Amino acid sequence: MKALLVLGFLLLSASVQAKIYERCQFARTLKRNGMSGYYGVSLADWVCLAQHESNYNTQARNYNPGDQSTDYGIFQINSRYWCNDGKTPRAKNACGIPCSALLQDDITQAIQCAKRVVRDPQGIRAWVAWQRHCKNRDLSGYIRNCGV
């Protein structure tokens, strides 16, 4: 009986653990999904952005008390404008997805939503971390030795 309880606990804890991408694995995933040069944004820019937003963590969440919104997932996409979490007042849901979709290990939906964000007039500047850590910097190290 104890063995079953331990096994059940291990399975439950494994199911809620985040996938944390390795830098090159993330770069290759982005490239396979058409992010290299998408709307003029380099692969290195995307990798830099994700490192500073979530440290490549698919389960990253950050609550913003000022507007009661939350940033979700590897790209830290905000519930005020881009997804629906059922909690954010006056949310727009421009990506047309539940915010929980941005927390999946399979980041296909997160990538599609990030593409939607970057098509907005603000473009990549919508991400504060990109402006603070990536803009006008040599980002070659973010994709070095990744084979992309």
Swiss-Prot record:
SUPFAM superfamilies: Lysozyme-like (SSF53955). Expressed in lung, small intestine and spleen. It comes from Rattus norvegicus (Rat). Monomer. Keywords: Antimicrobial, Bacteriolytic enzyme, Disulfide bond, Glycosidase, Hydrolase, Milk protein, Secreted, Signal. The lineage of its organism: Eukaryota, Metazoa, Chordata, Craniata, Vertebrata. Lysozyme C is capable of both hydrolysis and transglycosylation; it also shows a slight esterase activity. It acts rapidly on both peptide-substituted and unsubstituted peptidoglycan, and slowly on chitin oligosaccharides. Rat has two lysozymes, type 1 and type 2 of which only type 1 is expressed; type 2 being probably a pseudogene. This is Lysozyme C-1. The gene is Lyz1. Its EC number is 3.2.1.17.
